[in-house]
Amino acid sequence: MCDASGACDMRHVQNAFTEEIQLHSLYACTRCFRTHLCDLGSGCALVSTLEGSVCVKTGLVYEALYPVARSHLLEPIEEAALDDVNIISAVLSGVYSYLMTHAGRYADVIQEVVERDRLKKQVEDSIYFTFNKVFRSMHNVNRISVPVISQLFIQLIIGIYSKQTKYDACVIKVSRKKREDALLKQMRSEYGNAPVFGSGV
């Protein structure tokens, strides 16, 4: 939780990747970087009003089947530092969506990394740590596209948590290039060094 009242400062995440996968109701806290997919799911804090149901976390109003953003309640994201929030949020959503889409194949991974319809906090924190070490501190963010970063994290998570090697062609193709393979090796090392794991995974 972020401030004294325990409320996060949620802002709408909108970038090329969220548009590409048509993810229109992703929000991230500007202070703790926690994400929230506002979809009337269990993560929403809904309050009934005369206008419809409002998610207290995001300000989205559900008048019908689809959410309507209240622009006067949500300020646009303009701070440069929030670019990282957008990327990390897209990565977290990409990893979660990929695993859930391929749930039959990656059930053992899902059991290890998903809890209550989201990635476990330990996994999220390790992804943040790894992103900062490999992409932010080494200035790789501007050289590698967000979809490729997401695919690298998908391969990383599957590789670490799967009980047997079972990548599909979509996952494995990203690391066939020398640069991406080197990044993936560095990501494995940093993920294992994340403070939540202590001395390694």
Curated annotation (Swiss-Prot):
InterPro entries: Herpes_UL92
A Pfam family of this chain: Herpes_UL92
Family: Belongs to the herpesviridae UL92 family.
Designated name of the protein: Protein UL92
